[in-house]
């Protein structure tokens, strides 16, 4: 029996993209819910679990880098997007199945590395699916299709999280890996393989630059346009900071919640049911949040939603403090601690109430970024905003795990609830101006950004030399510096591409320094190296950030005339239009 090409009909296209997005949600639910729960049950500490969950989101923060390669390196026989979807889905299944024989928690580092590769393929698949949607969906189908795609992702997370936990009670945990891989491959077999893309016009390949050169040029173009758009207006620049900050308290949506669920005595079925209900509630309130924001104003409603996210966290924090449930409770002992029933009930109430507030927030936040996006580069700028949101999730999961072990649950939750409100200070400046055209302030913002990042990188040296004095707080500072290094790397990559008049040596140095800064994320695994290599790596880790800081301060002294040249004409035109009116 020949399966139908779902792309051939309107109903088929909607069905196809729903199921394709299911495969995007499965890995996230599997890691953040199912694996995190099982690791805590095996007495893996919250810090290790937080680092595991945080690393899982990193590929999504850099998914914009995959776009040029997916555009350029394509198979006309398999389909330009279909080929990438099929290949990445197969690789997702293969990488997951390769972990079946790993022993947890003994081989957690290797397990994390393999799942990081697994989720990289997931992020690549996301880019290919979105590109296919843009090319195949009719304009009147896009609204419903987007709703179905988000619903598919939510169901995928429930399948990979709650579904795996339900199943593990019958089969054990490791066999559920076959279920997850099989779910992905089922979509490959019944949806992706039968699809047929429209045949594109044949592309000449005899002359001209190589595909690698074309892809590199496209990536450079993306970086330059994103850099200029972020710095072009005050609203867009503030939006960059807003994207990097957590939008409200985050702990009840990350590993802290599953850690507590295990410690309070919930079995796998109960944890699965808790996460299933929270997913359903959050999905429903996403729609309501968007509707209310259109009616009562985005900034006003978003402020209420973000503030509301802290209330369940503070409620649960107070109950934990009241009952003396402060530090993580070891698991697997002969005499397990029995939690008061009031705390179990409080966890349910707080988690479901948090799902309401989080759903309302998600339904509104994206529209805020649309408000400050320059229409001329909308796809580039909005994609970059969405990618950076994943960086906030990654570092939040990491620091919270460290803090739980250092200062306990209540204080970690208090910090999270308060830190989640910081973004509210930026909301008044997240306001669109006429046309969102550049206002002439980009050079000034570029210099200020380079100076701040440069000083932060230089601060790494005294921190590293005296980190022992910080005690249990040192790992949290490590997380802060990781964010600084990633932000500095992105600035160097994009800024080096913009500064066309700068010496070529500077541009090359910026590129290589950016790559080395990104590589510093691997410093947590230096202990796995042999002693001579570990000593060399330790020296490199010590001196690279200050060297990057010096380079950034040098960039802060530049005039950034390239940005001024781009700004001048649109800004003048906007002012002239305003005067004419």
Functional labels for PLM-detected ranges:
Residues 1-11, 199-238:
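Juxtamembrane intracellular "pre-TM" segments in multi-pass secondary transporters
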Residues 2-60, 237-242, 246-264, 271:
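Helix-loop boundary and gating motifs at the non-cytosolic
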Residues 15, 44-58, 144, 262-281, ...:
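Loop-to-transmembrane helix entry
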Residues 35, 123-137, 360-374:
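Intracellular juxtamembrane helix-capping segments at the cytosolic ends
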Residues 62-79, 285-301, 404-405:
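Helix-to-loop junctions at the C-terminal end of transmembrane segments
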Residues 72-89, 295-308, 410, 442, ...:
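Cytoplasmic membrane-interface "Motif A"-like loop-to-helix N-cap segments
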Residues 85-105, 307-340, 428, 524:
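C-terminal ends and interior cores of transmembrane alpha-helices
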Residues 87, 93, 175-193, 411-429, ...:
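Symmetry-related core transmembrane helices of the 12-TM Major Facilitator Superfamily/SLC fold
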């Amino acid at each position: 029996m020949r399966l139908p090409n779902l792309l051939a009909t309107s109903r088929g296209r909607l069905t196809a993209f729903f199921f394709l997005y299911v495969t995007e949600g499965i890995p996230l639910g599997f890691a953040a819910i199912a694996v995190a729960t099982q690791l805590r049950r095996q007495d893996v500490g919250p810090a290790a679990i937080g680092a595991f969950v945080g690393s899982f989101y990193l590929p999504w923060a850099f998914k914009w880098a995959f776009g040029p390669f997916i555009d350029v390196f394509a198979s006309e026989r398999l389909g330009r997007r279909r080929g990438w979807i099929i290949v990445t889905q197969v690789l997702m299944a293969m990488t997951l199945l390769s972990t079946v024989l790993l022993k947890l928690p003994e081989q957690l580092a290797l397990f994390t590395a393999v799942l990081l590769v697994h989720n990289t393929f997931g992020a690549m698949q996301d880019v290919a699916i979105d590109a296919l949607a843009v090319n195949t969906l009719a304009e009147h189908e896009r609204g419903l299709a987007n709703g179905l795609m988000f619903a598919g992702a939510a169901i995928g997370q429930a399948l990979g999280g709650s579904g795996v936990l339900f199943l593990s009670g019958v089969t054990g945990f490791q066999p559920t890996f076959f279920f997850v891989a099989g779910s992905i491959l089922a979509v490959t077999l019944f949806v992706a393989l039968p699809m047929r893309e429209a045949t594109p016009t044949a592309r000449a390949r005899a002359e001209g630059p190589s595909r690698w050169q074309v892809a590199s040029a496209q990536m450079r173009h993306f970086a330059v346009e994103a850099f200029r758009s972020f710095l072009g207006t005050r609203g867009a620049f503030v939006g960059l900071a807003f994207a990097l900050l957590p939008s409200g308290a985050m702990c009840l949506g990350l590993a802290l919640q599953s850690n507590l669920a295990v410690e309070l005595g919930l079995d796998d079925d109960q944890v699965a049911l808790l996460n299933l209900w929270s997913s359903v509630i959050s999905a429903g309130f996403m729609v309501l949040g968007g509707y209310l924001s259109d009616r009562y104003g985005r900034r006003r409603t978003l402020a209420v939603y973000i503030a509301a996210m802290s209330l369940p966290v503070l409620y649960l924090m107070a109950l934990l403090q009241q009952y003396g449930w402060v530090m993580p409770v070891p698991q697997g002992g002969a005499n397990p601690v029995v939690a008061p029933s009031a705390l179990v009930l409080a966890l349910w109430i707080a988690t479901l109430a948090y799902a309401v507030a989080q759903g309302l927030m998600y339904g509104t936040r994206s529209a805020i970024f649309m408000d400050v996006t320059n229409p001329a580069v909308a796809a580039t700028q909005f994609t970059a905003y969405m990618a950076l949101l994943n960086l906030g999730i990654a570092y939040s999961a990491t620091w919270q795990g460290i803090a739980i072990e250092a200062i306990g649950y209540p204080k970690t939750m208090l910090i999270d609830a308060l830190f989640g409100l910081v973004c509210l200070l930026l909301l008044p400046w997240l306001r669109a101006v006429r046309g969102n055209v550049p206002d002439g302030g980009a050079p000034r913002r570029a210099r200020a950004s380079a100076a701040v990042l440069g000083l932060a990188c230089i601060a790494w040296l005294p921190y590293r030399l005296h980190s022992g004095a910080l005690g249990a707080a040192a790992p949290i500072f490590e997380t802060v510096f990781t964010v600084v290094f990633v932000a500095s790397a992105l600035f160097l990559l994009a800024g080096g591409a913009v500064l066309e008049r700068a010496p070529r040596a500077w541009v090359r140095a910026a590129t290589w320094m950016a790559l080395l800064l990104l590589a510093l994320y691997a410093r947590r695994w230096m202990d796995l190296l042999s002693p001579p290599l570990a000593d060399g790596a330790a020296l490199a880790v010590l001196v690279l950030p200050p060297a990057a800081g010096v380079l950034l301060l040098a960039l802060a002294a530049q005039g950034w005339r390239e940005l001024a040249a781009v700004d001048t004409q649109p800004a003048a035109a906007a002012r002239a239009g305003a005067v004419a009116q």
